[in-house]
């Protein structure tokens, strides 16, 4: 576009827009943020706002769309939620003081990952900005990941191998935005979710921002980290030997510098004003839960509706603050593997559990705290509004009370609240003594500062008070002086205060009255004295507002300089709150403290499903036990039982109890001894994944392959009806082979729920497999679900019975029964089973024979002599063909 065709202001706009081509540019003009050209069209469409126009010079009228500045947060939230980035251009000087064109600059770029506005954030969920650097080798991708939440200060780095592991970390974090160094052939810019050009090999559901490669280079990134945190080496951060992690972190910091110009100013204390120094972690520090497992076990949302209600987190989260809620969610998605850390959390829960009075009082104190973690960053970034500062002050003011409350505490976490940083208490007091308790949300209209704080402010206010009083009295004095009883003092926007007199009496007014307006029944006058007072009030009011604003900003800066210390207590409080919530659940739901061991045992006595138990009337849930992990029990349990009997519930409850234990929580069981797991795998139900072009069965097999390839002795594997999605014989064969492989090769602790009753034969063949069944009571005309798990295998599924209960038409039920009888009598599988019964004399116990023949570990190799035994099955299944 030829600049000569544009007014100077529009030239400036176009110039800025060129610098931020991937963001919507919001250009401040007076009380509005205006957008022009395509941005205007886009925003008017997305937000359903009126598209207007503006004269832009010789070019004529151009499209324009505006939002009032005071509604900025609301509209910005909508745009960011849709995955857009916003470049906010503010006026850097008051329009009336500008010589020529008002100076305007882009002060902030808001992108989905760099949001700090309360309206744009979810209270109980982190909002992560991630950065990834990948090195794609011939065999394996090596990657570095950095992620941060600029609303709370969290900052982590990690380096790992394997595309899948990276995707799982992303699935855990659900980053709002992912930064990548641009690669050859790709440009710069932002890709909204679902963009068909999503970066090679990465999931399409995220927002990606492609960045220049330079800040992601090792030397640059390292220098950036060292500089930012005032360090001489990265040794202390633990990432010295992790070049890809460093590169990702450097790219992330650089992005913040560039987009958050006004927020990210060097902090006087050194360090980053918004992010604490990055912490390094490894995937193996934590219990690994893959995406399927998080989904299948419904940790944070239900499978069917994606709802929070009905998830494990719904049962667990009794924390009182949003920061406690966020912490709990993080713990749930990233359970521990370090027994010492688990014990620390358990200790705190136990202390709270054993002291109801401590718990009650702690609960009400926590209730009165605000989200200190986010408030810390609101003050650090200089964006906190008066109400937020008041919330900060009142929360800090509670710290001494908290310290007193935990004075006798025995566990380290609670003890760490005993020492209160006096600077924070001071700050809290100063905020409380400076700010009025319920100030308006805006900064520039006064009403913020208490009397007695500032002498000048008090003087101005007093003067305004006197002048107002004088005006209030004026009606009375002027009535007396003029002898006009109907004289009134009025006010309107157009010309301020005036004296109103009915037209009939207009002749009686004193001569110093100046006529301003004549209405039908009334004449309006002013006097020089009145105008003088009025002007004085107006100037004083402006001065007051200005003074209050200054005092407020000063106080906010003071608070900002303590951000790191606030963040630190906030973190402790968040952890205390999360554990407080877990203690509450433990009390209300009768959870017990599990014993954590280093071996492979998984012993649960009278365990319950935390969510199902909550949704049933009290006492109706039937507890069940389990022993897994040789030598404490079998390694693999084949679980059979009728439809609707409770197999899936049992299987999931074991996984949930293990996860609860490793996140440090108590568990719904009478007693539990649990060896630490490295991973929990699940394969449950059939979910179509049409989006990725995979069939139901293909998804099932993919997930199964993943389990067989990655599970180990330390893993817990939960398989629900493997092989169901294909022809019966294929499915049965696969189920058999998978179970056998898990028991003999992987030796993972496994629960294998199935309707293939043939699998019960594995118990007789393999020493570390046992059969369990969920029993029902069969009456003459119906069955009763007992939901009890017992040793032994079931031989019927009562599927037709369940169909009847579900309301299948009677003729269909009758016909199904006929077909079933025929099938059982004549099918090859039926024949096979019956002939197998004959061919196996009861005296010849195959389990004994198997043990003699197998190798010294008692576990056969797949191709070992045990094959003789395994051949039993194919011959019996396909008797006619062989
Ligand atoms: N231990 C229990 N105590 C009380 N109710 C239970 C218990 N276990 C399961 N139930 C109830 O039974 C219902 C069915 O359980 P579940 O889905 O586990 O059965 P299933 O054996 O897996 O059935 P299917 O073979 O059809 O998949 C649950 O929704 C729950 O309401
Ligand atoms: Mg089931």
Curated annotation (Swiss-Prot):
Superkingdom field: Bacteria
Binding site for ATP: 641-648
Region spans: Disordered: 833-867
GO molecular function: ATP binding; ATP-dependent DNA damage sensor activity; damaged DNA binding; mismatched DNA binding
GO cellular component, one term: cytosol
GO BP terms, alphabetized: mismatch repair
PANTHER family: DNA MISMATCH REPAIR PROTEIN MSH1, MITOCHONDRIAL (PTHR11361:SF34), DNA MISMATCH REPAIR PROTEIN MUTS FAMILY MEMBER (PTHR11361)
Described purpose of this protein according to its UniProt entry: This protein is involved in the repair of mismatches in DNA. It is possible that it carries out the mismatch recognition step. This protein has a weak ATPase activity.
Name of the protein in question: DNA mismatch repair protein MutS
Organism: Synechococcus sp. (strain JA-3-3Ab) (Cyanobacteria bacterium Yellowstone A-Prime)
Gene name as annotated: mutS
